[in-house]
């Protein structure tokens, strides 16, 4: 009997080891959405590309939906459990009865610039001419209105806003003269070869940071209630991804290039630089920016009421900060 004890002991240890390995390797399948290939959404695809979701126990399928309004519809329908959405889209859906909640925002401002025809040199030149956006309530819509106001003009009244579609459609409408300009993320102008243009104003020109819940992990209230730990792991992955992006410039530029399918050095440099400094270390949901979006959404819906607490719950982020998780990531 003594001869077999070591063997049995070894087998027991092996079985325990295999069981622990199986538990450690167990990955929860989840669909996660991102809404743009530009650098502002890099926190999402960097987390996927470098395995931060996997590190936090998620077998993630990253799905590209190039519109906040469409993405919001997918989250509401339950097709996407957690995804990126901006505060404007969430507020607009919420006043319509949707049970949506932003649980954390990596980017709480809107890094956009207003690209216009080269002949437009002043706000007065822009008056009466149309600006193109993707859809009402989208980030491009919010950016267009903020930039127009920044010029001292009134959106719609002084400068008509047209829904023309995504970035390719806006570029086509601009080239064809249907619109006089369009709001654009930083760096895109470097790709506008053959299109005479200028940047008339940028949110970076504003005297005060433009508060806006832009890149926000969003889900439904029922999903958050039933799968709080899953949402927590998504946020942990995004926090780790944000840290990597802010501290690994050249590697991050390559990832932007991979997802945007661009190799233009000036574009990669400008887009990375603009976004890296704006990503928040602690991804809380800006109250000031959210309340502005609530005000605008409520104004478009008769008898609608909405509060910050109705569409924002960053309690998980606060828990992660209090636990020391974020400090540990940034050591």
Regions found by a protein language model. Give the residues of each.
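Bacterial N-terminal signal peptides
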Residues: 9-19
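Short, glycine-/small- and polar/acidic-enriched structural segments
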Residues: 26-166, 170-176, 180-186, 196-203, ...
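Periplasmic-binding protein-like
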Residues: 34, 106-116, 197-224, 235, ...
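Pocket-lining segment of extracytoplasmic ligand-binding domains
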Residues: 88-89, 168-260
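Secondary-structure end/capping motifs
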Residues: 225-305
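Sec/Tat signal peptide C-region and signal peptidase I cleavage site
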Residues: 20-26
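Bacterial N-terminal signal peptides that target proteins for export
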Residues: 1-11
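Conserved C-terminal helix/tail region of periplasmic/extracytoplasmic solute-binding proteins
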Residues: 295-331
């Amino acid at each position: 009997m003594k001869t077999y004890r070591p063997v049995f002991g070894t087998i027991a240890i092996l079985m325990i080891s295999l069981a622990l390995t199986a538990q450690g390797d167990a990955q929860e399948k989840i669909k996660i959405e991102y809404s743009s290939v530009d650098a502002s959404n890099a926190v999402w695809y960097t987390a996927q590309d470098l395995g931060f979701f996997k590190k936090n126990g998620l077998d993630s399928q990253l799905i590209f939906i190039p519109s906040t309004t469409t993405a919001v519809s997918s989250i509401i329908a339950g097709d996407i459990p957690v995804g990126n959405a901006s505060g404007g889209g969430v507020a607009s859906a919420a006043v319509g009865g949707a049970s949506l909640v932003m649980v954390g925002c990596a980017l709480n401002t809107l890094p956009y610039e207003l690209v216009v025809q080269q002949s437009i040199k002043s706000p007065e030149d822009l008056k009466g001419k149309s600006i193109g956006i993707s859809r009402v309530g989208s980030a491009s819509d919010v950016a267009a209105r903020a930039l127009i106001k920044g010029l001292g003009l009134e959106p719609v009244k002084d400068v008509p806003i047209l829904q023309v579609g995504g970035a390719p459609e806006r570029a086509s409408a601009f080239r064809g003269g249907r619109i006089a300009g369009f709001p654009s993320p930083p760096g895109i102008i470097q790709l506008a070869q053959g299109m005479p243009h200028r940047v008339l104003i940028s949110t970076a020109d504003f005297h005060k940071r433009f508060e806006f819940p832009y890149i926000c992990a969003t889900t439904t209230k029922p999903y958050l209630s039933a799968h709080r730990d899953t949402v927590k792991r998504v946020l942990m992955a995004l926090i780790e991804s944000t840290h990597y992006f802010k501290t690994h410039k050249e590697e991050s530029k390559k990832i932007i290039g991979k997802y945007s399918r661009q190799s233009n050095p000036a574009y990669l440099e400008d887009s990375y630089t603009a976004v890296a400094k704006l990503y928040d270390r602690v991804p809380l949901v800006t109250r000031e920016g959210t309340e502005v979006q609530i005000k605008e959404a409520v104004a478009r819906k008769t008898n609608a009421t909405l509060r910050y607490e109705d569409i924002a719950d960053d309690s998980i982020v606060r828990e992660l900060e209090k636990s020391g998780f974020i400090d540990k990531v940034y050591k």
